[in-house]
């Protein structure tokens, strides 16, 4: 970001200077109305673009962003690429429940997905649950409007068939909205449109509960 702005904010927040903290200059600003592609192609001197460049050049291990989600995803896709055999990136959100934390994937990266993309989401979500949440054999559920196999739209029905036959996925079947907060599986798979609605609804319910 802009060094002068960052240093001023650090002073206001009483954050001390440290040799472990390096400010990397970046002077362009990604507006929330920018498209993700325009933000990456036209604003190469933005903080998100510079941050992803640092990971690409092995000068950083990870990027944390509270800004434009589309720009962060697009920059990562263009500069870092995806894992082998993964066609599209996905956003994984760690969600709470009464019993345990679980992975929601996709939480908004791809509003329009094909069944194969959701299977890839299940594989990525399972890997995250296994290595980060410590679940030995993560249980995977598919978000639908009913637990029966015949329930759901065309995307859900075809995805369900693929999940049942894909090695490496511990698929437990379809789940419904009320399952999310009581006893959800370790990984909940859905398209980005549905996942983003779930995420935003959860945020609003939390805000209401605090009032």
Label each PLM-derived region with a short phrase.
Residues 4, 111-177, 186:
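Glycine-rich phosphate/diphosphate-binding loop of Rossmann-like nucleotide-binding domains
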């Amino acid at each position: 970001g802009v060094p002068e702005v960052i240093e001023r904010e650090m002073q206001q927040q009483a954050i001390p200077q440290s040799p472990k903290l390096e400010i990397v200059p970046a002077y362009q600003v990604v507006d929330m109305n920018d498209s993700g592609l325009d933000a990456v192609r036209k604003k190469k001197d933005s903080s998100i673009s510079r941050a992803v460049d640092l990971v690409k050049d092995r000068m950083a291990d990870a990027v944390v962003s509270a800004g434009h989600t589309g720009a962060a995803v697009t920059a990562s896709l263009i500069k870092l690429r995806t894992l082998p055999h993964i066609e599209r990136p996905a956003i994984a959100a760690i969600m709470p429940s009464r019993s345990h934390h679980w992975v929601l994937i996709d939480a908004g990266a791809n509003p329009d997905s094909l069944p194969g993309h959701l299977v890839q989401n299940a594989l990525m979500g399972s890997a995250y649950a296994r290595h980060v949440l410590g679940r030995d054999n993560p249980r995977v559920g598919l978000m639908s409007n009913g637990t029966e196999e015949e329930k759901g739209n065309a995307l859900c029905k075809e995805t369900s068939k693929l999940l049942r036959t894909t090695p490496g996925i511990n698929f437990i079947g379809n789940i419904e909205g009320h399952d999310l907060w009581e006893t959800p599986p370790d990984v909940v798979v859905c398209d980005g449109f549905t996942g983003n609605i779930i995420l935003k609804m959860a945020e609003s319910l939390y805000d209401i509960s605090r009032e």
